[in-house]
């Protein structure tokens, strides 16, 4: 898919890259030099997991559980949208030196936002 705008798949850049996709977009439109695409913290991975709506999701009420499940460095982004099944309501980004651990933590935070019980 080609999008001439910032796209959902690049939302990880908000927390993981030196220059986010939003800033890059503005720089390109304004004919400014593009910023660095490097990760903010060398030697780490930025993992993003989307929060999709379900019939029982109430993400704003589960923020504390999500931050706890995601651990240090987990960033929760809620878009303030009305909950509908399948609708993207937000995302969680975790930056970690271990990509498998980052993915596990991001998934745990999204599960907490959905109101699901921890699986460990």
PLM segments and residue spans:
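Active-site proximal loops enriched in glycine and acidic residues that flank catalytic Cys/His/Asp
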Residues: 1, 78, 96
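Active-site "cap" helix and flanking loop/linker of ATP-utilizing ligase/carboxylase catalytic domains
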Residues: 3-55
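Short glycine- and Lys/Arg-enriched binding-loop motifs that mark or flank ligand-binding interfaces
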Residues: 6, 27, 76, 82, ...
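Intrinsically disordered, low-complexity acidic/polar segments
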Residues: 9-11, 58, 85, 101
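Generic secondary-structure signature for well-ordered alpha-helical cores
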Residues: 27-35, 72, 111-118
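Glycine-rich active-site loop/lid that clamps phosphate-bearing ligands
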Residues: 42, 49-83
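C-terminal structural segment of proteins
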Residues: 47-59, 77, 103, 107-112, ...
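Generic C-terminus detector
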Residues: 81-120
